[in-house]
């Protein structure tokens, strides 16, 4: 396997893509954003590097538990005692290049937000929270909020009601998304002594908290109806209404079907579509009527 293939394998490409889409949505929500396409390319470059770097550091720290879990066991074939130092150097170079590029070619505020996302994932979530508390993904989910702040700031050098709305939309969504996934890996988490919610409180109690979190998320998603300072365009609200209804349906299915793990997996996959469609709804602010 080539070095490029190995890097792709351990950098959690799906997370990087989501982070880039969040940043792009916030970027395009800025009035006049289409006049700053060069800045968008720099933002994507810097954000991608930081996200990939964070994933590598996460994998380095979790080298002791990844082989015990089916979902992550293949990473140990790439990242081991012989290759750890090399990947540490690569990850360090990535995050430094990300910071310097965004600082010089965009602005210090954007670079600070990118670095904040990196630090919250590596330090706050991976090192401090993941192995200590079942609230790991709730608090650590703040890492997913920083791309929205960086996206807006890459043009304006500031924050706004819109960028904060997008940032906390991702934050509210993360527990619903990840808890549905973790139900399917509950045995691995128990084996690895990782206190993910299903491993601590059981599947039925986890479904209860998924429903609670989803209810909060759905209510939060319609906030632009009541706060005029949040600018997300005319198409966002009808898309949010449809996706909210579908999300409630999918996350309620496990409870209706006797907590079938397949339903949790379907809810996990739909939660990806949910967030993608809401972000696309925000991007469609560019469509003028």
Swiss-Prot record:
Reactions it catalyzes: heme b + (2E,6E)-farnesyl diphosphate + H2O = Fe(II)-heme o + diphosphate
Transmembrane spans: 13-33, 37-57, 86-106, 109-129, 137-157, 159-179, 207-227, 232-252, 267-287
Entry EC number(s): 2.5.1.141
Involved pathway(s): Porphyrin-containing compound metabolism; heme O biosynthesis; heme O from protoheme: step 1/1
Keywords: Cell membrane, Heme biosynthesis, Membrane, Transferase, Transmembrane, Transmembrane helix
Keyword Ion transport: no
MF terms in GO: protoheme IX farnesyltransferase activity
UniProt keyword annotation of Cell membrane present: yes
Recorded topology in the membrane: Multi-pass membrane protein
Gene3D superfamilies xref list: UbiA prenyltransferase
Cellular component terms per the entry's GO annotation: plasma membrane
Gene Ontology biological-process entries: heme O biosynthetic process
Subcellular location: Cell membrane
Similarity-based family: Belongs to the UbiA prenyltransferase family. Protoheme IX farnesyltransferase subfamily.
PANTHER family membership: PROTOHEME IX FARNESYLTRANSFERASE, MITOCHONDRIAL
Record's miscellaneous remark: Carbon 2 of the heme B porphyrin ring is defined according to the Fischer nomenclature.
Task of the protein: Converts heme B (protoheme IX) to heme O by substitution of the vinyl group on carbon 2 of heme B porphyrin ring with a hydroxyethyl farnesyl side group.
Protein name, UniProt field: Protoheme IX farnesyltransferase 2
Organism: Picrophilus torridus (strain ATCC 700027 / DSM 9790 / JCM 10055 / NBRC 100828 / KAW 2/3)
